[in-house]
Amino acid sequence: MNPKRCAACKYLRRRCPKDCVFSPYFPPNDPQKFACVHRIYGAGNVSKMLQQLPDQTRAEAVESLCFEAKCRVDDPVYGCVGIIHLLKTQIQKTQNELAKTQAEIAVAQTKLSQTHISDFM
């Protein structure tokens, strides 16, 4: 048993075994992280997911699960898809603004070059 139980084992009110699948990813000083993931996915499902993954990808998977769970708690209808949609909309607006600015630059350069040509004649 670990001297300090991980956030998952504290939340689940159980002993934290030496081979606890949660302890590397849910430290005792961040209980909200596990609570959010547990609320959305359930401890059993998260445990199964982590055990099916190679050790080197588990940390990234936990970060993704935490982000997605927090998004789902904050926005129960859309979750992280709402954020993705918002970001895509911002990208599209920025691309449109960039295209407009590039067109204005092209017009200004054309006028400038025509001014220089007429100055030489």
Curated annotation (Swiss-Prot):
Pfam families the record matches: LOB
Disulfide-bonded cysteines: none
Ranges for domain LOB: 4-105
Protein family (similarity comment): Belongs to the LOB domain-containing protein family.
Protein name per UniProt: LOB domain-containing protein 23
Organism placement in taxonomy: Eukaryota, Viridiplantae, Streptophyta, Embryophyta, Tracheophyta
Gene name of the record: LBD23
